[in-house]
Amino acid sequence: MSKGKIIVAMSGGVDSAVTAGLLMEDGYEVIGVNLRTWEYEAPACDTTKKSCCSPEDIRDARDVGISLKIPFYVIKMEKVFQEKVIDRFIEDYQHGKTPNPCVECNTFVKFGALFEKAKALGIDKIATGHYARIARNGERYAIANGIDVGKNQAYYLYGLSQENLKNVIFPLGEMTKPEVRQIARRMGLPVADKSESQEICFIPENDYRKFLEKKNVEFTPGFFKLKDGRIVGKHKGRENFTIGQRKGLGIAWKNPLYVISIEDDGSVILGEENETYNESFSVIDLNFQGLAPLNEGESLECRVQVRYRHIPIRCKITKMKEGLIVHPLEDVRGVTPGQSAVFYPLDSDYLLLGGIISKGSIQMRIVEPAISVLN
């Protein structure tokens, strides 16, 4: 007996292809959908590179649909992608932040807009090839880490709503990448050995500066300064820098210097390694998953992850009128405005909540310089 219809977001890669195949084997009536998010003929896009969502990927997704004998459609998402991902990406850099477009894409395009399309077709369920799982904490749903540590994508999925989480399936959450490729070969899928994308889909070669230039973004020149206000050089645009950056500064100093703050007036503040640790920071634009929303003034000890490959550390969070104040209980450095922070329980691997690290909330503290490795 059929388990009903389900839409599978098919990127053209092996993960989404296996997702579709597994759901078919499990009794679902699978409809494959590819989300066209970017005008690939645009001069900013070099389709010869390994970026996701290219015309080649659309062809590969269609070939998988033919191989599995399922309906396949391409849905135009350029407008919502432009508004929710690209425009915000540009705006964040113009305000001295370092954005994470993959988070916005997952929240507003891959899930938000796709669920709207599914409901318009009378379909409740969607599935993707993310390496993540769904957990329950009482009455609340949450993203939980996939078992493949190297591929775990929970960090990018904190923006999913409770309604999204009730109706999404992640068949690969309990698998490793080698297992997925083995299944693809068993199914005879044409993308079984296809290499993975290595770039942001609209940023060829990950050269965001070139992308901003092609979008006619005006860079904000200014001075390199130390924390005490001393000017140690000039730069051609704060958009060229990110928190924690060491290379490419062009400043001769007795010790290596790092970017520790990017100011509204265009100043880029530099400090030595022992000035890069974070005493506290704030997080805004919160989305609660496994944790019910906190009331203003409530506090909680948990763990925080401040970038994709960061190992979560213990912290104390306090709910403020707008957002959270986070006090790390272990050393952390390079906390970057515009990036996302996600929070886990002390003893479990599901997401409590997540949000955007806010500009203007970074306070530096002096620690022993022996600690020199970015988590």
Curated annotation (Swiss-Prot):
The subcellular location is: Cytoplasm
Q: Entry's InterPro entries?
A: MnmA-like (IPR004506), MnmA-like_C (IPR046885), MnmA-like_central (IPR046884), MnmA-like_central_sf (IPR023382), Rossmann-like_a/b/a_fold (IPR014729)
SUPFAM superfamilies to which the protein is assigned, alphabetical: Adenine nucleotide alpha hydrolases-like
**GO MF entries:** ATP binding; tRNA binding; tRNA-uridine 2-sulfurtransferase activity
Q: Cellular component per GO?
A: cytoplasm
Q: Does the keyword Magnesium apply?
A: no
The entry's active site is C105, C201
Catalytic activity from the UniProt record: S-sulfanyl-L-cysteinyl-[protein] + uridine(34) in tRNA + AH2 + ATP = 2-thiouridine(34) in tRNA + L-cysteinyl-[protein] + A + AMP + diphosphate + H(+)
Q: What is its EC number?
A: 2.8.1.13
Q: What class of enzyme is it?
A: transferase
**For site (Interaction with tRNA), what residue positions does UniProt give?**
H130, Q339
Q: Where is this region: Interaction with tRNA?
A: 151-153, 307-308
Role of this protein: Catalyzes the 2-thiolation of uridine at the wobble position (U34) of tRNA, leading to the formation of s(2)U34.
HAMAP family from the UniProt entry: tRNA_thiouridyl_MnmA
- Family per similarity comment: Belongs to the MnmA/TRMU family.
Question: What protein is this chain from?
Answer: tRNA-specific 2-thiouridylase MnmA
Gene name, per UniProt, is: mnmA
